[in-house]
């Protein structure tokens, strides 16, 4: 079984992990109520999507 010959340094480990991060979700402002919502989803505050009321409150 293969075993590492040298210990991986902190610098090398951190360089490898530079792309290992969480991306920020795409938030847009709701045109109906002005609250921030996830893109391409129904607004949780007013229940509208694409300018139409989809969920009645």
From Swiss-Prot:
One of its GO terms (biological process) is translation. GO terms for cellular component: large ribosomal subunit. The keyword Flavoprotein does not apply. Keywords: Ribonucleoprotein, Ribosomal protein. One of its GO terms (molecular function) is structural constituent of ribosome. Pfam families: Ribosomal_L32p (PF01783). Belongs to the bacterial ribosomal protein bL32 family. PANTHER family: 50S RIBOSOMAL PROTEIN L32, LARGE RIBOSOMAL SUBUNIT PROTEIN BL32. This is Large ribosomal subunit protein bL32. It comes from Staphylococcus haemolyticus (strain JCSC1435). The gene is rpmF.
């Amino acid at each position: 079984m293969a075993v590492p010959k040298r210990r991986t340094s902190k610098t090398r480990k951190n360089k490898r992990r530079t792309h290992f991060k969480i991306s920020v979700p795409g938030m847009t402002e709701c045109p109906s109520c002005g609250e921030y919502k996830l893109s391409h989803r129904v607004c949780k505050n007013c229940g509208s999507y694409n300018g139409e009321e989809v969920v009645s409150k």
